[in-house]
Amino acid sequence: LRWVVGDMWKRVAYWVGLFAALLLLFACQKPLFMWYNALKPLAFKDYIEAMWHGMSLDATVAGYLTAIPLLLLLVSVWAKRFPLRKIMRPYWILVAIVLAIVFVVDTALYAFWGFKLDATVFNYLDSPSEAFASVSVGFIVAGVIIISLTATLFTYLLLWITPKRLDKVRHQIVGTFFLLLIGGGLFVFIRGRVT
């Protein structure tokens, strides 16, 4: 067991750290959303309760986002030197951009729309001018700048967590089985949260 843990530690630590970082990232977004859109001062416990209440959904999203990294960790077990960060870079850039857009748009437009982003937003895809009819050009420009900065910050964080490369595991079969167990647990976790 000692040599298995020793070989797999870097991979497991990365995945657990990544999952925790995404949870923390999502949790920190809630107080910012509440602070920006609050009509009256909120107590500290209100922020904590919101973060706790959203933890279940945040964990589900984090599970989906860490599924691809887990698959790559599985592949890395059989590679001599696996350039994980290089391979993950496009994925994390895309994820960071999407997360930044959702967070900033949701936070900024809640005061105009009166509801958080959901499937309703797709009703405006054919007529985006209606969606932003009550928003000034300056507001949109500021939003684009904030989205860019937020996406850059998210990208830096996700790439910083990701190891530059992973070395080959000495006992590939055991390592593969170990990661498959984690993957199975993740699948059950996601399915349980969704249903």
What label would you give each PLM region?
Residues 3-6, 67-93, 161, 166:
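Cytoplasmic juxtamembrane interface segments
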Residues 3-15, 42, 46-50, 54, ...:
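Membrane-helix interfacial "entry" motifs
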Residues 60-73, 143-159:
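Hydrophobic cores of alpha-helical transmembrane segments in multi-pass inner/ER membrane proteins
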Residues 7-20, 83-97, 173-177:
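Alpha-helical transmembrane segments and their helix-start/interface "positive-inside/aromatic belt" motifs
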Residues 28-57, 90-147, 191-195:
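Membrane-interfacial interhelical loops
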Residues 14, 18-25, 57-65, 94, ...:
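Hydrophobic alpha-helical membrane-embedded or membrane-associated segments
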Residues 169-194:
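Internal/C-terminal transmembrane anchor helices
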Residues 79-80, 148-178:
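Cytosolic-side transmembrane helix boundary signature
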